[in-house]
Amino acid sequence: MSSSSPLQRQIMRICQLHAWYGDLLAQSEIQPHACEISELPLMTSALLEKHYYAQQARQEAGLSVFKTSGTSTGVRKAIYYSEEDDEKYIAAKAESFREWLAATDSAGPNCRPAVIKKALADMGTGHAASTALTIFKQLGWQAESLSFELPIEQHIAKLEAFRPELLYTMPSILDAIVSASGEPHLLGIQKIILVGEIAPPEWQSNIAARFGIEPQDILDTYGSIEIGAIAAYSHELGQYVIDSGIHAEALPAELIDERFEPLQANEAVLVLTSYVRTLFPAIRYVTYDVVRDFRTVTINGKERQCFSCIAKRIGTDLKHGEKISLYDIESVVHQFVHDAELRVKLIQNKLSVHIRSKSLKDEMLVHIQHAIEHKIGDIGLMIQNRILEGISVTRAAENEQLERGAVKSKKIYF
């Protein structure tokens, strides 16, 4: 390995900013100047708990600090961004959005050029939300934001009053907007950027139709508070393309933790090394997200890593629910109804899929149940092995309030 390789430079920088990481390498007799990435320790949740999250509060000038949601452990943890981290994130996102808009404007006869003058950020808390207005202003747009905690009627009122051409939001918020507005195509939204939750292609196509736009007018992005921007969905490739400043690995689950059961042949746990992040030790960071069809492709003469979807997330508590892919369930349901908003529960080994949809007919419920059981291999196998007692698919009343998470609502409820 060259002494000036990006990996070696990043290792040395992380050792300078996180002294414990250098100690960790020394204990394992790993030479930062002469090691392969596969020799470096996996940055697991246990390692971060011991060293990063337990550290004294950092005091450097210009710091931004964000707290995790704490949904998995009940404890909110501090994650730091330096001014450099923020600047690189904002520049990368602005360029990504600019390239996407240019590409969709010239994608074909069905894609009319969009003139973006106003953009609205309507999402949860965290790094993506805090930087959205800065990114929009760099792109020359009039920008405003809205708290996700407000009643949905206020979201609709804001959209009607501000009339943004571009909406930056979360899929569950978009579901609620579509359900409450009745005629979302009248809101004048021409482009949608998504963050924070799963958005299967079937769902994206149905949402695009409701707004009177094309699927290519939706950009689904994948990121995390630890890493920042990770990937964005390419409708042309049908793949999530990983950011050029990141090196990704797709590892077997049992290599991460011997308690994890093997995944399906085309699935692996995503592990990331960022060459731009500094105040988080993003070297072989284990996301615990399970991706499918990980591969390397050539785009515009450059090799890029990509995957087809995030199927699910695994963790050390080993719930049966970790074998269940919300992505797959959403994909199946949206093959039957175009306006479905759903909540999935796993209670006492019974899987419940509760659907709110104006187009859903009662006779469809049994067909959706059959499709979930027979098209999603893991669920069918769990029922066959009596790990799951069965599936119930029910419809929600039109005015029924669906469960909402503290930030994310697209998840499996236990």
Per-region residue spans from a language model:
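Active-site glycine/GP-rich loop and adjacent strand/helix microenvironment
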Residues: 2-6, 10, 142, 147-414
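Generic low-polarity alpha-helical segments
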Residues: 7-10, 14, 113-114, 118-119, ...
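Short, charge-rich amphipathic segments
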Residues: 20-30, 53-67, 81-89, 131-148, ...
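Charged, low-complexity, helix/coiled-coil-prone segments
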Residues: 30-40, 65-74, 92-100, 117-122, ...
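Active-site phosphate/ATP/adenylate-binding loop shared across adenylate-forming ligases
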Residues: 45-206, 210
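Nucleotide 5′-phosphate-binding alpha/beta core
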Residues: 1-112, 125, 349-354, 358-414
